[in-house]
Amino acid sequence: NSQFSILNSQFIYNIGMLHILDKQNTIINKFLAELRNIDVQKDSMRFRRNLERIGECTSYELSKTLNYATTSVQTPLAEAKVESISDNVVLATILRAGLPLHQGLLNYFDDAENAFVSAYRSYLNESDFEIKVEYIACPSLEGKTLILCDPMLASGASMIAAYEVLCAHGGKPAHTHIVSVLGCTEGVDYVLQHTNPEEVD
């Protein structure tokens, strides 16, 4: 059973569940506002840092959906039981725009494996295009939790192309989360139309 989560400026969309971020203001509002501000956008370093910060915030939210197992740690006083993430996480991104967001996720999931895909639009004419994938580096995804990120979910075609090629090279993950910072309805709909949770084990 595969789970797809989409984070954008308005909501976290989780198949079967919709969370409206506007109902609960968070620090993400500030980061998103600066990302969209035409003046602040000119500061490349701040733009990248805000993407990284959003990746960190998203990691915290995503961690609530993962599987945990009880483990033991030796403290200075005694042995303590703690709940630790039991999922094997693989962080994947679409080069190169996704790197700052990927880094934010990696800052929290610091023991995760990494995967990279190079995907771009190859225009056939002024309005039609196809997605070209020229590079992929991917570990085994079998039975693991895949987190695939790209800052902008526009048409959704690049995201689906990246997901399909990752699965073709690494196998089917146990769970998949798709993370974007900004998205449009068309892209969300495209992702939902081209994924079937019941077929992804």
What is each model feature region?
Residues N1-I12:
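Short, basic, low-complexity termini and linkers enriched in Ser/Thr/Gly/Pro
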Residues I12-D201:
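PRPP-associated nucleotide enzymes
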